[in-house]
């Protein structure tokens, strides 16, 4: 039976028994199940958040990644939502950490997910309301771009392309904040 790559997991986190792939329910993917205690390992998606930040001159903020995946490529500020953290609070935190900016969330652009990839990416449109443009250790540099300057061929992820495309097309759900 084929199981999607589920990491290097071979032993049960509860009893250290051996994990094996089993089909528990028709139509569901195979799961790793402990042969000793029956514990089922579920691999949940990971939630990430991003913000397309508009500056007073109507340019947007992008950062050039200093980490893999996508080293040297451009993305908007974003990152993973911490367990128990409100998604909008994570968006504000990531803008502050990665761009040095305080922002106002203007609305949801969209939610992006892809087959066989764990991240679910929630992207907001935002406006800078304070702080000073500055990058952290996860970025090589930070810059602002007008719509015709966006480095489309040097964007890190499919979600970055799609969210920027949606942003410039005017996709915005202002009541979803």
Predicted features by range, described:
Residues 2, 54-97:
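Conserved Nudix-box catalytic region and its N-terminal flanking loop in Nudix hydrolases
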Residues 135-164:
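NUDIX/MutT-family hydrolases
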